């Protein structure tokens, strides 16, 4: 059985976190909206009477329909060895994923700080203020936490040690997205987080992920998705920011 992933066809967005898990698991899936007639199918599925999703992404597995990125990953992680078998471990990985989702939402709000219904050009002054605070205070706050997990009780390859989880894949995507959106700022901030940077590189080198990144299935970052690059928002981090935790 091939999974059916429903997400917008031209952006990585939140659907990319699901794609990375499916690719690492090596399971067949169809990116429905990228297929002929797929957008119509996706919109129809969103209007379905049973368990409708508020927005993409959502995943169809047989008769089962699962929405919300972290919820989908919780489901896939248990099925395909991308999460621990015990309840405490599963909840811990889900907790990390939800924290990643918080930072992803804040990254989006740097370019749409007032309203998603407005164009970026309609809120540029506010976006500059939001991005400056995001770079100076918010990224380091979150990165401190991730670095601390990777460093306790001693430095490790992945969040749980030697075993990769969907949260590791999502951290790779988070770092890659922030590097795209804020290359100057991240070049400085990254230096303070060697374990997080190493995890990004380690995930990128995993055979299935490396093959995916080199394929046409991997959509490029662009200015329609969550992580968008605008030169005026890519401000150099404050000298006090970017110190590693742990």
For the regions a language model picked out, list residue spans one by one:
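GST-like fold's C-terminal all-alpha helical module
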Residues: 88, 95-205, 244
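Long hydrophobic alpha-helical segments typical of transmembrane helices together
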Residues: 194-246
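GST-like domain detector, emphasizing the conserved glutathione-binding G-site
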Residues: 1-130, 230-246
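Active-site-flanking alpha-helical
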Residues: 77, 174-175, 213
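Short, solvent-exposed turn/loop segments enriched in Gly/Ser/Thr/Pro and often Arg
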Residues: 8, 166, 216
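Short, contiguous strand/loop micro-motifs
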Residues: 4-6, 186-187, 211
